[in-house]
Amino acid sequence: ISNSTLQEKRDAFRYVIGASSLIVFTTGIIVYNFLNIEINSKAKIGDFKDMKKLMKSRSVILIGLIILTAYMGYKTTDIYSLYASEIMLFDEIEAARIAAYQQYLRPLACISIAFFADKSGNINVIIGGFAIMLVGAILFASGIVVAGLNSLFILSLIIVATGTYILRGLYFSILKDGKIPTTLSGTAIGIVSIIGYTPDIFATPLYGYLLDTYEGIKGHQLVYIILSISSLIGIY
């Protein structure tokens, strides 16, 4: 990779985008053609009264906040490679490899925790996920994860990533714990998604501002302080 020309890197990036788009498009066709859903013609779809009712529901608001605070952890995955290169002094290839490897935790954590949640309950496991994410965030926020302590860096990254993916694998499953009627689950998911995915709007600019304004480890510490606060809110 390090010996690739700019044109070769562009071509590789183009192939990645093309392959991803093809997979998404193919998945859409498969779902459309093979997922049979029975629709009751008498049922009202998109009833505004139901939407207003759900927007006033304490359960919907709380689930939205759980997703929001959990998603703050997911947004930190964008800066793992930056931490590796700026603070741990890894080269560009090593930093990218670290960011790629942590992605393998996602299917492992999500699948494993699904079985565990069946026995322990979704809410209890989600609280545990926030607690795990909090521990990792505190390690990074403390400033002790610095160049030369590669094992501590890997351990801290695994802790944060594991907590993040535990939450990501379960947060929509708590809709039933919120006693939301199945007939309104689609509308409820839409509302909690609007609340929960707002970090897509503000988290990246916020993290970017902190990292640009406060050079070195200071900026990263501030990012993980925010993540620690988000984890505490999620636990609460």
Question: What do the predicted segments below correspond to?
Answer:
Residues 2-21, 208-231:
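A membrane-interface helix-boundary motif in multi-pass transporters
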Residues 21-41:
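C-terminal membrane-cytosol helix-exit motif in multi-pass small-molecule transporters
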Residues 36-63:
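Juxtamembrane intracellular "pre-TM" segments in multi-pass secondary transporters
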Residues 59-110, 203-204:
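Extracytoplasmic gate region of multi-pass secondary transporters
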Residues 98-106, 192, 196, 230:
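Transmembrane alpha-helical segments of major facilitator superfamily
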Residues 109-122, 211-212:
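Helix-to-loop junctions at the C-terminal end of transmembrane segments
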Residues 121-174:
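C-terminal transmembrane helical hairpin of 12-TM major facilitator-type secondary transporters
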Residues 179-215:
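A late C-terminal transmembrane helix in Major Facilitator Superfamily
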